[in-house]
Amino acid sequence: MTHQTHAYHMVDPSPWPLTGALSALLMTSGLTMWFHYHSVTLLLLGLTTNILTMFQWWRDVVREGTFQGHHTPVVQESLRYGMILFITSEVLFFTGFFWAFYHSSLAPTPELGSYWPPVGVYPLNPLEVPLLNTSVLLASGVTITWAHHSLMEGNRKNMLQALLITILLGVYFTLLQMFEYYEASFTISDGIYGSTFFVTTGFHGLHVIIGSTFLLTCFIRQLKFHFTSNHHFGFEAAAWYWHFVDVVWLFLYLSIYWWGS
């Protein structure tokens, strides 16, 4: 092994970006097959490949950052910039969906009866399950902040409790969203209202599932004493991501559920 005279991490070749990209292709193709041909084989293959990739990629990053000490302060600063850019790209991703919604709702076309919501579509009551979902996500934002402050103060017990509550709130939100989809009187095929509603809320729900998985990984790592008060960027990135999901939901609730109804 050659002697390293700098603080940067020279990453070893890894197969996980390739398998991750292939699993994403399999999942999107599998979704198309499921929607049109009611076949879940390709979707299940993509999900399995994606879960295996996540597990092994996270394992390698934990080894490099926690056990081998490659995540120096300089590397952590670069990772922070990377996470900020990633969240910025996610903001632009959701901007497209909000643009589609406002483009259609602010000036409804004659095909929609020049009316919003379109005639025949009965939107969900924003003061029922959507308001409960808003409360759940806002509460999870409080608990993730509690977990972060507990970690900074070296209070491991409180950190684990707060993080577990956040994960459970994320799971509860997902279950409520599934119930809402089941009870909705319209589908993704019901014109521009149905498509913008389900695509926007669906992608947000997917981000909640990803965020919950991220937090669950941090919970397991904290059980194994991986985090300290001054070396915990993995958890910090998960907290940033979770706050981003919270903010997107607030815009989504105010735009689609409350104003759009």
Curated annotation (Swiss-Prot):
Domain of life (superkingdom): Eukaryota
Topology in the lipid bilayer: Multi-pass membrane protein
InterPro entries: Cyt_c/ubiquinol_Oxase_su3 (IPR024791), Cyt_c_oxase_su3_dom (IPR033945), Cyt_c_oxidase-like_su3 (IPR000298), Cyt_c_oxidase_su3-like_sf (IPR035973), Cyt_c_oxidase_su3_a-hlx (IPR013833)
Residue ranges that the UniProt entry lists as topological domain Mitochondrial matrix: 1-15, 67-72, 153-155, 224-232
GO biological process, one term: respiratory chain complex IV assembly
Record carries keyword Mitochondrion: yes
Protein keywords: Membrane, Mitochondrion, Mitochondrion inner membrane, Translocase, Transmembrane, Transmembrane helix
Family: Belongs to the cytochrome c oxidase subunit 3 family.
Protein name per the record: Cytochrome c oxidase subunit 3
Source organism of the structure: Loxodonta africana (African elephant)
Lineage, broadest ranks: Eukaryota, Metazoa, Chordata, Craniata, Vertebrata
Gene of this entry: MT-CO3
